[in-house]
Amino acid sequence: MSPIAFLLPFLLQMVLSTNVSTTSNNGVTEIRLDNKIVDLTKATVLERSKCCTVYRPVEDSSCIIVSSKHGASMVNCHGSVSISTSGKLSAEEMAEFNSLTQKYSG
């Protein structure tokens, strides 16, 4: 087997991977994909519930973002999942966020 064939899966993963960063402070969440701040006002809404919204950002259309009203977020990009919470979530909001996170993290 040639060295290139052996390294190809690793090289593809490096090329296709997205650097994900989420931070929350006092209920305000900032999400970055490859060091660019995600603008959720431009993202496609995939699902909306009472407490949470699921987005597909224009910055990387292969990513999924679940965002709650009070500062919880989950970002799934190329199988890499990042979760951040801040602020106070009610039991209902936390249950809804957890349900959507499970649905969209796989």
Swiss-Prot record:
Residues of the signal peptide: 1-17
Q: In which tissues is it expressed?
A: Expressed by the venom gland (anterior main gland) (at protein level).
Its keywords, alphabetically, are: Disulfide bond, Secreted, Signal
Q: Which domain of life is it from?
A: Eukaryota
Q: Name one GO cellular component term.
A: extracellular region
**Subcellular location per the Swiss-Prot or TrEMBL entry:** Secreted
Report whether Chloroplast shows up as a keyword of the record. Answer: no
- Coiled coil feature spans: none
The entry's comment on post-translational modification says: Contains 2 disulfide bonds.
Protein name (Swiss-Prot/TrEMBL): Venom family 8-like peptide Pr8a
Q: Which organism is it from?
A: Platymeris rhadamanthus
